[in-house]
Regions:
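A contiguous, well-structured pocket-lining segment that forms one wall/lid of small-molecule binding clefts
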Residues: 173-174, 181-183, 403-441, 466, ...
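Internal gly/pro-rich beta-alpha loop/helix module
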Residues: 60, 161, 316-392, 590, ...
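Glycine-rich phosphate-binding/hydrolytic loop that grips phosphoryl groups
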Residues: 485-506, 510-512, 550-560, 603, ...
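Conserved phosphate-binding catalytic cores of ATP/NTP-utilizing and phosphoryl-transfer enzymes
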Residues: 257-262, 311, 333-340, 364, ...
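A phosphate-binding glycine/aspartate-rich beta-alpha loop in the early core of alpha/beta enzymes
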Residues: 74, 219-282
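Intrinsically disordered, low-complexity, mixed-charge
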Residues: 1-174, 178, 185
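Conserved phosphate-binding/catalytic loops in two-lobed NTP-binding clefts
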Residues: 457, 475-488, 695-700, 707, ...
Length: 750
């Protein structure tokens, strides 16, 4: 008779892994035990079916569980007469992998809809297959006493389920019921409304066109009826958010199919237990008010992921709600009841609960480009799942702090990187405070208590750079600056385990190694270094950030043609006087920086075509340009010129203006401009790949959320015999910069 020890690592805590092992061993008549050893689960087996156990183990895992490594060894038999689950210990001191928050499972959903079930209409129903994890944990090991559920002692019925190995709630730390768990209440301003069904009250008020703040699993949403134009506009007014698209939540997939196009991969993602927001194209039956996603051809959509969401739909007759984060753009979501109840200037009512959110976590956002997944924001449902470093690196610990906007941080230990949830814009003090708190929380969860280096952006004035030096003093370690687009590139390279490549890096801004503003770059990169090979033509930015907010100023600078710009005089607040002042500013060089940003060029095209002349949110002008281009019916050729590896964008923009003033179709010009820029950058990349003897060309940066630009680069590069890669597990935008920083820093520590 055989005897073996099996050690498994991965997402094996708080996911029903030990009960699964228990059931599998019992099914195969095996004796022994299973127990947690910190970051490892140990399985001791005796019997004749051990090989069958090993074969079935990874194939029948619980929904949330994931095995990253499994080691087996023969051991001496001890003569066990049963199989048991024994008490955990901290024998291993490695990093425990805590699972992310997972959408309610079918079994729990069935219970809250069954009038005969004791959890009927209970909005916090959960089991080992679903529910909150990351948002409720304070420290490891993952036991109820170290979560926000510790405030809710189990009743006798729940305790019985908790202690039964064959029950799906066995050691489910988030389980509860209406007798022992959290409760919901509804308020109008500071006054509680007495009701035994506060969710029904909320559904009724939403039907009346009211705005409701709803505290959820990882934060708070502001919610209105998505079909109610008046309510949507009122929400915009109160938030001072005039144009940025609102995400929506629909009750089921059939509802989504009524207004959006869905591919098989999009369906699989939007219905997965991670339940991200997926950016979908509007279909011909789209019938929401224009105020919901103004000027865009797509809309962010998610399905319900908590019991409360399902109950909200069940109690009303609206199939789609606006669900937008209750925060100022770039600042952290509100998570405390005190904050939420002080929203009475924005929300009419507040639906809150008494379970603490220990780790706030925004909704994840995903966009597909021809069935290739791209994270816009990797957060709820994914954080804190780690990334593997696909290179030979040391075992030193690195904390990487990201750039300044759309920040995440990352902690690297051994060959793994533990990314944070979405943090936001650290030029806001509240967000910087949240970041510091989140770092402390992640240190407790991962048990990474010290760092050998702190990685950050090269920009000397970023708050994250200053924070890096604070941590450097605390841990008595070095600060390693990593160039912005190099970090982008290595995050992409790690997706594929590629050692070297040519990279097209396109975004709004990144601090260059020459202290200029980069953003349209052709780089040769490896994991330790990079070389700048080419870029977009550099242009002056009159007024610095003013040129970002008002892209008509950038257009003036790029085309540098008084006759062409004169047609746009009405877009300048002070008319011809302002135009003359800007030209004078460009001549003197006062408050004028140079940029090679692709984002600024696309914004200028948008301004030239009178699509968007004032930016009210990040990426607005470029996104609206893409949406206008989406409806193009005819191909227009715009010639481009490359000299010394620099793409001449002045002539491209001048041609855009000429075509528009000749009366060519706006959508066709927009489409042509995007594709011309993509072809020009691809041509520079191809020529340099040939010189360097490199056969892989990658695309990174926020511009590559643009489907037309990405597809054009891919087609052009592959037609020329090179391999084209794009982000598949990481953000194309700034959300992955910390990941790249961490990898570069670890290699430099070698």
């Amino acid at each position: 008779m055989m005897a073996k020890k099996i050690l498994t690592q991965g997402i094996v805590q708080g996911v029903g892994f030990r009960p699964y092992i228990y059931r599998l061993a019992k099914d195969l008549n095996l004796n022994g035990y299973v127990r947690n050893l910190g970051n490892v689960v140990e399985i001791i087996l005796e019997g004749d079916n051990i090989d069958l156990f090993i074969d079935r183990l990874p194939k029948e895992l619980p929904p949330i569980a994931k095995i990253d490594s499994m080691k087996t060894e023969d051991i001496a038999r001890e003569g066990f007469d049963d199989f048991t689950i024994i008490e955990s210990s901290d024998e291993f001191s490695g990093v425990s992998v805590i699972p992310p928050d997972i959408a309610i499972c079918d079994s729990c959903l069935e219970e809250i809809r069954n009038p005969k079930d004791r959890r009927y209409k209970y909005p916090f129903n959960a089991c080992t297959d679903c529910g909150p994890r990351f948002t409720v944990i304070d420290s490891v090991p993952y036991d109820r006493v170290r979560t926000s559920m510790d405030e809710f002692p189990l009743c006798d019925s729940c305790l019985e389920e908790y202690g039964e190995p064959l029950n799906r709630r066995y050691h489910g730390e988030a389980i509860c019921c209406s007798d022992c768990g959290p409760q919901m209440k509804i308020y109008k301003g500071p006054e509680e409304i007495n009701s035994n069904n506060p969710i029904k009250v909320a559904a009724d008020k939403l039907k009346e066109g009211k705005i409701i703040a709803i505290k959820g699993i990882g934060g708070t949403h502001l919610v209105v009826d998505a079909y109610n134009d008046k309510a949507v506009k009122e929400l915009r007014k109160r938030l001072n958010r005039p144009n940025q698209a609102f995400a929506v939540m629909s009750k089921d997939l059939d509802s989504v199919k009524g207004y959006a196009k869905l591919s098989k991969t999009e369906i699989a993602t939007i219905t997965s237990n991670k339940r991200p927001i997926v950016v979908l194209k509007k279909n011909d039956n789209y019938n929401f008010p224009e105020s919901l996603a103004p000027g865009l051809h797509n809309i962010g959509v998610m399905l319900p992921y908590s019991p409360m969401h399902y109950l909200l739909f069940d109690e009303g007759d609206i199939d789609t709600y606006v669900m937008t984060s209750a925060n100022t753009p770039g600042e952290p979501m509100m998570i405390t009841n005190k904050e939420i109840l002080n929203l009475n200037g924005i929300s009419d009512y507040s639906l809150i609960h008494n379970r603490k959110i220990l780790n706030r976590c925004d909704d994840s956002v995903i966009r597909f480009r021809n069935d290739t997944l791209s994270f816009i924001r990797r957060s709820r449902g994914y954080t804190p799942e780690p990334y593997k470093i696909n290179y030979d690196v040391n075992d030193l610990n690195v904390l990487a702090l990201g750039p300044e906007l759309d920040v995440t941080f990352a902690m690297a230990k051994d060959h793994m990187i533990y990314p944070s949830q979405h943090i936001g814009n650290t030029n806001k003090l509240k967000t910087l405070k949240f970041m510091k708190e989140a770092i402390e929380n992640m240190k407790r969860i991962t048990k990474i208590n010290y760092f050998d280096a702190i990685a950050c952006d090269l920009h000397p004035h970023f708050f994250t750079t200053k924070l890096a030096h604070e941590f450097s003093d605390e841990f008595e370690c070095d600060v390693i600056g990593v160039q912005h687009h190099h970090a982008h590139s290595i995050a992409l390279a790690n997706d594929y385990g590629i050692d070297e490549m040519i990279v097209i890096a396109c975004d709004g801004v990144g601090y260059g190694s020459d202290a200029a503003s980069w953003g349209g770059e052709i780089l040769y990169t490896n994991i330790t270094d990079f070389e700048r090979l080419g870029h977009l033509q550099a242009h002056k930015m009159p007024g610095g950030d003013m040129a970002t907010k008002h892209p008509i100023r950038m257009l003036l600078s790029i085309i540098d043609d008084e006759d062409l710009i004169s047609k746009y005089v009405d877009y300048f607040k002070y008319g011809e006087t302002e135009i003359k002042n800007i030209y004078r500013q460009l001549e003197t060089g006062i408050n004028v920086g140079l940029t090679t940003s692709t984002g600024r060029v696309l914004d200028s095209v948008s301004a030239a075509l009178e699509i968007c002349n004032t930016r009210t949110y990040e990426g607005e002008c470029s996104m609206k340009l893409e949406s206008v281009a989406y409806y193009s019916k005819n191909d227009i050729e715009i010639p481009f010129e490359i000299k010394d590896n620099i793409l001449n964008t002045r002539e491209i923009l001048r041609e855009v203006v000429r075509l528009y003033q000749k009366g060519e179709n706006k959508s066709d010009i927009a489409n042509a401009a995007q594709k011309t820029i993509a072809k020009g950058l691809s041509q520079i990349a191809i020529e340099n790949a040939d010189k360097k003897g490199v056969n892989v060309i990658g695309a990174t940066g926020g511009v590559f959320y643009n489907e037309a630009i990405t597809d054009t680069c891919k087609k052009y590069i592959e037609e020329n015999g090179y391999n084209f890669i794009q982000h598949k597990n990481t953000c194309a935008g700034d959300g992955s910069v910390s990941l790249g920083q961490a990898i570069v820093a670890k290699t430099k520590l070698n």
